[in-house]
Amino acid sequence: MIAARRSPMMLAFFDRYVTRYVRRRFHRLLLWPARELPAVGARPLIFAISHASWWDVLVGYLLARRLVDRVSYAPMDEAQLARYRVLARLGVYSVDRGSVAGVREFLTYTTARLREGAAIWITPQGEITPHWRRPVRFQQGLGRLVATVPGVAVVPVAVAYEFLDEPRPEILVKLGAPRVFEAGAAPREITRTLEHALETELDALRDAIVARDLARFATVIAGRTSTSAVYDVVRGVRASLTGRPDPARHGDVVSDPRRLAR
C-alpha cells in the first residue's frame, strides 16, 4: 500500500496551479447550495462524488481546500498512484481492489484517518460513468467502510460539466444533505441508501441545468468572463467593419460570496 504523505508546501503549490488551470479551461466553478456545509459536528466525514470525468479529481481537490476545515485524503487505484507518486504528498493513498488484503488495508487505513478527524473524498462508482446514467450504482467499498465507522456522515456530491451561455463550459456542483449511519447498518443497505442520495442530487442538478436556474449557485472559482460566443462573433465583426472598439460588458448573474472565492 502507498500511504499519503501530505506536504503543506506541495498542497499550496498544487492549489495555485490547479486554480489557474481550471480558470483557463472553464468559465466558472459553481456550487449549490451557496452557503457553508451543513454542520456535522465532530463526526467522521466522507464526501461521495459522482465520477463522470477525470476532472472530478481536481474538482474534489479544489472543494476540499475551500469548503472543509479538516485535513482531507482521497484513495486512488494503486497502479495509478504508483505511476504518479507525487500525489501522495497531496493526501492521496492507494487501494488495491483486486485483492482481499488490499481491500482490508484500505479499510484499516481509511478508518484510522476518519477517527483522526480527517475528511475522505471518494468516487464510489469506481469508474467514469456518464452523469445521467440511471440507476446510479456504487462498488461495495463505501458501504463496507461506512459500516466499520459508526456515526459517520456521508455527503453526496453531484458534479456536471456543461456548456451554457459561454464559449467555455461550467463546472456545476450540488451538495446533498449529510446521511448519518450509526452502528449496526448493513453494508448493502448503506450502499443502496447512498446510491439513491447521489442520484437525487444528480437529478436536481440536471433539472437546474435544463432550466438554466443558476441563481441558487455560488461562484467558487471564476474564469475570464465574456458574452456568449455568438454575440462575441457578431460584435467582433461589427467592430472590424466600423473600426470602433466594442464597449459591451457581461455581468455575472450568479452570487459570488467572497468567503468562497480564492
Across the structure, where does each feature detected by a protein language model lie?
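Non-catalytic C-terminal accessory region of glycerolipid acyltransferases
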Residues: 2-6, 43, 104-262
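Short, glycine/polar-rich helix-capping loops at beta-to-alpha or helix-loop-helix junctions
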Residues: 15, 81-83, 166
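Short, flexible loop segments at the rims of nucleotide/cofactor-binding pockets, characterized by
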Residues: 21-28, 51, 96-101, 131-134
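Short, well-ordered coil/turn elements that cap or connect secondary structure elements
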Residues: 23-26, 69, 87-89, 149
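Conserved beta-strand scaffold positions in the cores of enzyme catalytic domains, especially
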Residues: 31, 74, 92-94, 154, ...
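Residues at the C-termini of beta-strands that transition into short coil/loop
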Residues: 35, 78, 96-98, 158, ...
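Catalytic core of membrane glycerolipid acyltransferases/transacylases, capturing the structured
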Residues: 41-100
